[in-house]
């Protein structure tokens, strides 16, 4: 989406855009890894994400708004086998590592869109 928006082109969505994804800022991932390395927890697994599901359509609309463009996404046929729902359960990381994501999707999008 970012490349298309930088070229002032509509983002392309495959399917209806109802697919749910869990987006997280790389700084939050790094902080979670540092917490895990510095913890006393051994031989455990953690899901690291925002814990918030966002549809692809919603993501595209957020990015368009931040870009201040007057465009709409283009819809193309869905990709066979595409996962409909993917959202992390981060309770284990919250409880064992005392970790929470700090950067919202909107903040992260503003950062990357305004940076590039």
Regions found by a protein language model. Name each.
Residues 4, 8, 36-40, 96, ...:
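Generic structural signal for alpha-helix termini and adjacent loop/cap motifs
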Residues 26, 45, 77-100, 104-107, ...:
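Conserved C-terminal active-site "lid" loop/helix of NAD(P)H-dependent oxidoreductases
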Residues 9-18, 26-27, 35-47, 52-57, ...:
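Glycine/proline-rich active-site loop of Rossmann-fold NAD(P)-dependent oxidoreductases
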